[in-house]
Amino acid sequence: DIDKSCNGLVELPAEEKHGILWVHPDPNGSFDLEAQLGELAAEFDSWGFEKYVFQGNTIFEHQMNWKLAIDTFGETYHFNTLHRDTLAKDFHGNCQMYDRFERNHRMMLCLKNIDNLRGQNAEECNVLHACLPVYYIWPNVQLIMGLNGPTLVRVYPEHANPNKSFSRISFFLAP
């Protein structure tokens, strides 16, 4: 048992589902997770997030509004120019798939390795060898599914300045 009166601890509405702990930031708030995720709920189940082990996290501070920080991850056309020595080596910068699920969306960033998979039976291929799925869960969460495990990005506004934000990035690996 924990004495919640110590250290300003406040109980928040939470639900553990799809291998993820979902928390509402308002102690008086509520949420309907299945309604929030919609069609993505079944897809999240298929990834088996519960099997991955937390490895640590890092925080990045941004000199931009949190909404801009979220939106700037929404395209890949700039990879070939701005990231030619890094991301452009692994990704086709002019190709991605985009699906919208109410307020959420999913992007599939096309890996150059997809070229090596042409002609193979799609049922025998691991989708993670062809692309990088990136989920945006409204309003501030990005979930990136990589070959080694998921990366969870949460972007928050800086309370004192709406022109600043920070990202808390958590890394998970298969045991």
Locate predicted features:
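Long, hydrophobic, well-ordered secondary-structure blocks that form the structural core
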Residues: 1-13
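C-terminal catalytic domain of Rieske-type non-heme iron oxygenases
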Residues: 12-16, 20-175
